[in-house]
Structure formats: structure tokens, C-alpha cells
Amino acid sequence: MTEQDLEIIQGTIAAIVYQNYDNGYAVLRVDVGAKQVVTVVGTIPLPAVGERLLVTGKWSTHASYGRQFEAEFLERLMPQTAMDILNYLSSRIIKGIGPKSAARIVEHFGDQTLIVIEREPERLAEVSGISPNRARIIGEEFRQRVGVRQLMEFFALHQLPAELAIRTYKLYGESTTDLLYDDPYLLMDPGLDAPFGAVDRFAIELGVSADDPRRVRAGILFELNYNLSAGHSFLPEDKLTVATAQLLSVETETVKEAIEHLLSARQLIRNTLAGITVDYLPALYEAEEYITQRLLQSAATTFPEPKHLNRLMKSAAKQSGLEYSQQQEQAIRAGATAGVLLVTGGPGTGKTTILKGLLSLLGEMQLKCVLAAPTGRAAKRLTEVTGEDASTIHRLLEASIEPASGEMVFLRDENNPLKADVVIVDEMSMVDVLLLHSLLKAIPMGKRLILVGDPDQLPPVGPGFPFGDMIRSEALPTVRLTEIFRQAQQSLIVMNAHRVNNGELPDLKNVKSDFFFLPCRSEEELRQTITGLCTTRLPQKMNIPADQIQILSPTRKGGAGTESLNQLLQSTLNPAGGGKRERQFGDYVFREGDRVMQIRNNYDIVWKKCDGSAVGTGMFNGDIGIIRSIDPHMETMTVVFEDREADYDFTQLNELEPAYAMTVHKSQGSEYRAVILSCWNGSPYLLSRSVLYTAITRARELLIIVGRAETVAAMTENAKRGRRYTGLKLRLQGKV
């Protein structure tokens, strides 16, 4: 198509039919005058009702939606008259301004309103009902919206995600475009989570050469940061060199020169482990070094055995109403004197009994204990089984956002340590090396640390595998629980978990217990079986309501994966209609009443207790909630997380995903009354023994595996764990 074939239309946005915050695509109804409203489609980031557009494009006819104007270029025309400005502001385009306040503002400033908001926002306080602080916030919101929108349009020209523009603007502010022209690879800041391929293409479009040192250095840092997500704390230097050279299509010598530059700038740390030269990001190197030092110091610290320990043990046992086995008594006694203690064991081996016993004994010793776990669900479960308050590690450390940088920081550290004599952490297999580093810094020297977990479950999502490394190092006091108690032996869930962990096939034929297998011949049969279990069989025949059932799958993709199952289960358990409001985001439609999950830590989301008793900040990866309401005018969605509720701006919906079904990895640290495991074909990396073992141990009363017996067998046989490059074990053993 030539420029002569393009047309130009001008009009006012009358309605927003659809908008995708991820890529900026929108479908608009635009009033072009003469009582004519047309449909305009294209990349139009953050449109607002009442906004005027000058659009260049072409007409087309959609098979389902009819005639529409496809936008290729657009110019936003700020409203000029007082009436147009009133309509524009009344659309709630700026948070803090509704129809009533818009009328008062426009009445006061007339056609100069937008100039005042942009250049002299403090003058808004001249309007009744607007405080100086609110005036400042309105000005910031307006400038940010204009800046983000301009950046989105700039990014759209270079095929960069619109959502990335929002995060980038928050980080770099009004100077973003100038900064990116100077160095496009600023987009590779880890906090932006930008795809390297898209950023690299963008940089080349701006004139960066293939062997530009900025590009090569960015490629090296990308490789290291990318491998953090695979669990690695470092990479061997030869592997890092080759991987970067292949990524960028440059010579290895060019990469080696860039590595030396990064080393001299302290952006990399070189180390030797087992005779191999390796490269760390500084934060990972410092974390391993500090953890090693603190744990070995704690291991060398033993506290005197309290007087009358036997009497205290009996008193603790009586208080908790429990009788200890020999292994359990050994663990509890060790907890009375050890500076650091590891307690490990599978399901049914009595870890909960030990936790209760330790708390009773340490209480008898007049020691203050704090309990923590990696996720909110794990912390809630810890509270339930011990009867004591427990929090997430992030909340224990008082995670907060540093205003100047926008980065997450912990307010509890070596300068503001925890006020506790003993810190007890459960579900340690989920804790990565960076989080453990932060935790140890907040524990004063001379205090006690008790770490409880099961290293045979899946390793942490983040870098390292500190709990597994600690146990395998044999350098720290450790109690291994191996005895399965008689009551636990009655549970096929427990016994099959141990069978799988030992490489034996689970019993799939027993139909009179808490563990069932339902074979399926096709993915469609699997999907229908799961639907029937959730809607009819479990609620009606076993009195287990749908909200107490969790679907798990090793995979995200495919008909048996979580993405497809979530769409199926939403349509079944929470269908459209009945006045329920919705919001499309990406490929998913969020609907009032949906079960959703927070998928990344966000330390500045404000929440409040549902009873209004408290307000706080921070929602964390793995938190599960229900969408209570969707407000299209305020562009917010309210989600209730058990006893708390939080409002999400529509631009934050990338932090949520449906949770009718979730991956086994996401379920770690949780326990559900009933678990249905979708077991079909998939990657050997995902269909592993540790994935199956972790899935089985998520069920409290009932586990149903739906799918192929061959897949269950393959998972049981696949004992391979993805290798993680981590130096903690060697450091603890003194082999560095």
C-alpha cells in the first residue's frame, strides 16, 4: 500500500470496546462528526473516552465485526475547548479526578485547565475540595500518563511490548527516551524483565553495531541473569563465553574482552571452584560467601544444655500432648543446644510433631521464637499445625520499596535485626540463596536457627539450592527423620509418596483409600473427567466443595496443561453472565468470582484487612485470592486474599493469573484438602520424580491422578534433576 492509499480521519473516542495492556492493541468507537461513529483498531496505547485522535490508516471489512478503520499512525489531539476538556477529564482518565471534581476544575480554569495540570498542578488547590497533596498527585499522574503513552508509542514503532514501557518509565522517568538513545541496553535492568531479543533488535535499529562493547557486556549479563531463573548461582567461564558468543554471533575473543571489563568494573566476580574458573554476579557471590561464614559460625556455637533438660522435655511433651519417638527426641534435644539445626524428612515422619515439641521446649526455656515460611500459604499452614503465629520470610524481614530507586529492600538487616532468640523456618527447600542471605543478615550473632524441610521436593524457583547443599555438605548439625509413623501408614498418599521417592511405582489399583487413579485414553477424556470431578463427583459424593479442590499439572501448555484447564474450569465453575463484570488481559478474561494467583512479588501493593483492622503493603508470589469486583471506570480490580483485599490497577494484571489449575512448581509449600493431578505427556524435564513426589505431598485428604499410567511410571523412573551450578556445598566443606 502506498501513502496515496492511506486515509486520515479525525474524531473523539466515544467508547473503548477492547484494549490489551500487554501490547497496546485497542478497538475503539470514534465519533467523527455528522452523527457518524466508526470502529478504529490498531496499536493505540492507553486510550481514554473523550480523547481526540488524528488517525492515518485504511478501511477494511472484518468477517465478524464489519467495516473498520485500521490505524497505522496516530496523533493525539489534546482537547482545546472547555467542554471538550470537561468530557476528557470526566472519563476518569486521571486518577483523583471524577466527573464532579472535573466540573469544578474546568469551571475555575476554563480552556487553560490542561496547561495548569501539566505545568502548575499546585494551582489545583485553588479549587474547593482539592488539597495541596491531592493537587500534586493529580499533576504527577497526568505527567506520567502522558509520558508513558508517548513511550508506548515509541516502543510500538520498534515492536517492544507496551507493558515494558510502563515499567521502564517508572524506573527512568521523564528522561527515559533520551537515556535509551544513549544506551538501549538499559532496558536489560533485571527489574524490567525485558526480552533480550527484542531489546537487542531495538538497539540495532538505533544504530548499535554487532560488536559494540555495550552490546557484548549486556549479552554476558543477560546470560548470567537468564541462568538465575534456571537455578544457577554462577556459570563456568568457558560456558558463559561460548553461550554469549553464540547468542550475539560474535567472536569468543570479543566476549573475553568484555568479561575482563566487567570484572574490572566489579559487575562480575571470578572464582575457582573444584579447579574450574567460574563467574558470578556480585550479589550471588556475596550471598554464598556470607551464608557459608554465618552457618559455620553458628555450627561452631553450642549452648549449654539447660538444667533439668529431661524434666523440661517431659513438661513440653505433656503440654503438647505428644509422645516422641527416638528420632524426634534427638531432634528436640538438639534444638535445645545447637546454634543451627537442620531437620529433614518426608511426609509422615513427624516434622510437625518436632516443631510443636521444639516450640514447647524453647518456651519452657524462656526463649522467644519466631516462625516463618517462604510463601503465605506455607506460613498459614505452619500457623495451623503449630498454633503459633507464623509469617512469610518477606514479612518477617519487613520487605519494603526504597522510594528513590523503586527497588525492594528489607528493613530488617544487620543494623536493624530481628528481636528473637530462635528463628524457625519451615519448607526450606523453597528458599533460594538470595532470600537466605537476607534472612541470615537479620539474625543477630549468637541467636539460634532451626531449618526444617524436605530436600527431595522441588528446588527453589530462584538461584541455588541452599537446603539441599547444607544437608549434602554434612558440615552442619542435621537430624534425618526416616521412621513413618503408624497413623501415617494408614494413608496411601503418604505411602505412595515414599514409594515414588524411593523409585517404586505408586499403588494405582487401590480404590478404597485416599489415593485414586482414573485412567484416560485421550486429552479430551482427561479434561472431561477433571470437570466432572470438580462440578459433581467430589462436591456431591464426597462433600468436598470446588473451592477446596486444587488442580495441578506438571505443564502449562497443551490440553492437559494449566493454561487450557484454567479456561475450561472457568467456563464451568464461573461462567459468564449474571451481571459479572470482566476484563480481558492478554489471552485470558478475568471475571468477578474467579480464583487468581499472584505470580510475582510486589512490595508496594497496598492491602487492607477485610474487617478494616489493619493496612499494609506487599503481595507475594503464590498468594491465592478471589476477584470480588472489577471497576471499568476506575480501571481497577479488587481481589480478596483470605482476610485481606487489594486493588489492582489494570496495568498490573500481568501480576495475576487464573488459579483453578496451577503447575506443581507453583503449589509448593501449600496443602489442599483435595488434589487432582493432570498426568499426560510432556517434557522429561517436567515429568520427573521430584515433580510427582511434590504433587502427591500437596494433598491432605484426597489425591486423584487423572491421565496415563505410563506417564506416572515415566515420572517415577525419571530421577534426573536439572543440574544447578552452586558453590555453597563446596564452601561449607572448605573445598574452595
Segments (PLM) and residue ranges:
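Loop/turn positions that initiate beta-strands
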Residues: 50-52, 593, 622
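ASCE P-loop NTPase helicase motor core
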Residues: 329-332, 337-511
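Short aromatic-glycine-enriched beta-strand elements
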Residues: 19-30, 633-639
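Accessory alpha-helical DNA-binding modules that contact the DNA backbone or grooves
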Residues: 25-33, 39-40, 48-277, 344, ...
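Pre-P-loop entry segment of helicase/translocase ATPase cores
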Residues: 156, 215, 225-226, 270-330
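Conserved helicase motor core of P-loop NTPases
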Residues: 351, 455-617
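Structural detector for short beta-strands of small beta-barrel domains
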Residues: 5-20, 57, 624-628
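C-terminal accessory regions
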Residues: 502, 610, 621-736
